[in-house]
């Protein structure tokens, strides 16, 4: 009641197959699958690049901070 039954879906599927043909539907499915695969690959590469940039910034920041070579005993002797 109000919803789409299995019979209505089957009729729509038959009409689509008759209009486009199985070869064309297969090609559309292949193209769509390739597009989704490419999108996922681009997203994962972008995440890897972002992680690399964060690590690089942390390394540069830690390298830029001066490192003291004096120990506490050296500081006490100077005072």
Curated annotation (Swiss-Prot):
Any one GO CC term of the record: TAT protein transport complex
Keywords: Cell inner membrane, Cell membrane, Membrane, Protein transport, Translocation, Transmembrane, Transmembrane helix, Transport
InterPro entries: TatA/B/E, TatA/E
Gene Ontology biological process terms in this record: protein transport by the Tat complex
Sample GO molecular function, one term: protein transmembrane transporter activity
Signal peptide per UniProt: none
Main location: membrane
TM regions (residue ranges): 1-21
Subcellular location: Cell inner membrane
Coiled-coil parts of chain: none
Region of interest: Disordered: 45-79
Topology of this chain in the membrane: Single-pass membrane protein
Basic and acidic residues bias: start-end ranges: 51-63
Subunit and interaction comment: The Tat system comprises two distinct complexes: a TatABC complex, containing multiple copies of TatA, TatB and TatC subunits, and a separate TatA complex, containing only TatA subunits. Substrates initially bind to the TatABC complex, which probably triggers association of the separate TatA complex to form the active translocon.
Family, per entry: Belongs to the TatA/E family.
Described function: Part of the twin-arginine translocation (Tat) system that transports large folded proteins containing a characteristic twin-arginine motif in their signal peptide across membranes. TatA could form the protein-conducting channel of the Tat system.
Listed name of the protein: Sec-independent protein translocase protein TatA
UniProt gene name: tatA
């Amino acid at each position: 009641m109000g919803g789409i039954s299995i019979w209505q879906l089957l009729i729509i599927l038959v009409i689509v197959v008759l209009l486009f043909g199985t070869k064309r539907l297969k090609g559309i499915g292949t193209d769509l699958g390739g597009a989704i695969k490419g999108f996922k690959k681009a997203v994962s590469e972008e995440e890897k690049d972002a992680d690399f940039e964060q690590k690089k910034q942390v390394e540069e920041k830690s390298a830029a901070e001066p490192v003291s070579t004096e120990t506490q005993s050296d500081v006490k002797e100077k005072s």
